[in-house]
Amino acid sequence: MVVFSKVTASLACFSAVVSAAAVPVKSPRQGFSVNQVQKTVTGTRTVNLPGVYANALAKYGATVPANVHAAAVSGSAITTPEENDVEYLTPVKIGESTLNLDFDTGSADLWVFSTELSSAEQSGHDVYDVSSSGKKLTGASWSISYGDGSGASGDVYKDTVTVGGVKATGQAVEAAKKISQQFVQDKSNDGLLGLAFSSINTVSPKPQTTFFDTVKSDLDKPLFAVTLKHGAPGTYDFGYIDKKKFTGSLTYTDVDNSQGFWSFTADSYKVGTGSAGPSIEGIADTGTTLLLLDDGVVSDYYKKVDGAKNNYSAGGYVFPCDADLPDFTVTIGSYDAVVPGKHIKYAPVTTGSSSCFGGIQSNSGIGFSIFGDIFLKSQYVVFDAEGPRLGFAAQA
């Protein structure tokens, strides 16, 4: 069941009530916005750059190259990674608990830190209290694993999940019971809210419905729009398109959701002012930091960067931090989506290093590209379930 309630500033005004079978009562449908936040964490936080890369590959079933795995295990890291856009998070209320979650259009699970973890594992995190309001889904379980060896698993509960001002009751919540230290050490992140298609939800024995699929029929339009920012929190707009957030008009392209992802085909690409390259098939994924492309495209890009090289020990392409990087342009229909070179200068390989890790890396031959945050944070992107389709425009 979905219930709309009155909330604050960034929320469009609305009110609706639906039945237990998630069939809406005839009342006005509206939309709402939620702002990302940058959670303050006490002490120094580090991020393993090759681990970020390895996780992105493993998420889509790619074989993680031995050197990337070795670099991830060795722990090459930077400090204060939020400055380099590793992740911005969105407050979500689950039952009586409010957690900061990573919204991920590349997965379909809502999993969170919970009171089923040990007190040491909960420390520094906001956690979901499974005893406060949730109802355990008997016999259901979930498990995830990533390329750097991290993972989590646990039980499944049904509870009320509130994003902005929309409440989805009876929503599946995957409560962590076991979790790796990599997640425990990331004190800013309390879990993940998947926005891919429900067909790839990993709950066993029966996949569950995503938050968006639960509420979309009660929105003014069955869509959400993403405005990620470079070096700043962004917003997610549910049910409406905010014309103040983009310039020009939206260009739409069809989505192939047969594999459960927001997959699309870009007509061509260009490095700097160079000639156009061939089409690129890929997935729009807010849960992946990097822009992962075919080897030929990656090579084309870094040929234009002085001092760039595929560094075996670093686990990917690196270049001098003072290098000038060309823009990377993807053409979608009549629209040229430009990724500024400064966005591709991702982060120092280690704290104080003069070498930087590139935001464009190889997709390790998986057969499609991943348009992660490096690409998305210069675009206004509409994820429209009606079609389905994606709409693109330059951010205002």
Swiss-Prot record:
The highest taxon in the source lineage is: Eukaryota
Record keywords: Endoplasmic reticulum included? Answer: no
EC number(s) reported in the record: 3.4.23.20
Extract one GO molecular function annotation from the record. aspartic-type endopeptidase activity
Q: Mind listing the GO biological process terms from this record? A: proteolysis
Q: Where in the cell is it found?
A: Secreted
Q: What is its main location?
A: secreted
Q: Which reaction does it catalyse?
A: Hydrolysis of proteins with broad specificity similar to that of pepsin A, preferring hydrophobic residues at P1 and P1', but also cleaving 20-Gly-|-Glu-21 in the B chain of insulin. Clots milk, and activates trypsinogen
| Entry keyword set | Aspartyl protease, Disulfide bond, Glycoprotein, Hydrolase, Protease, Secreted, Signal, Zymogen
Q: List the disulfide bonds.
A: C321-C356
InterPro entries from the entry?
A: Aspartic_peptidase_A1 (IPR001461), Aspartic_peptidase_AS (IPR001969), Aspergillopepsin-like_cat_dom (IPR034163), PEPTIDASE_A1 (IPR033121), Peptidase_aspartic_dom_sf (IPR021109)
The answer, when asked if Glycoprotein is one of the entry's keywords, is yes
Family stated for the protein in its record: Belongs to the peptidase A1 family.
Assembly notes: Monomer.
Functional description taken from the UniProt entry: Secreted aspartic endopeptidase that allows assimilation of proteinaceous substrates. The scissile peptide bond is attacked by a nucleophilic water molecule activated by two aspartic residues in the active site. Shows a broad primary substrate specificity. Favors hydrophobic residues at the P1 and P1' positions, but can also activate trypsinogen and hydrolyze the B chain of insulin between positions 'Gly-20' and 'Glu-21'.
Tell me what this protein is called.
Answer: Penicillopepsin-1
In its UniProt entry, the species of origin is given as Penicillium rubens (strain ATCC 28089 / DSM 1075 / NRRL 1951 / Wisconsin 54-1255) (Penicillium chrysogenum)
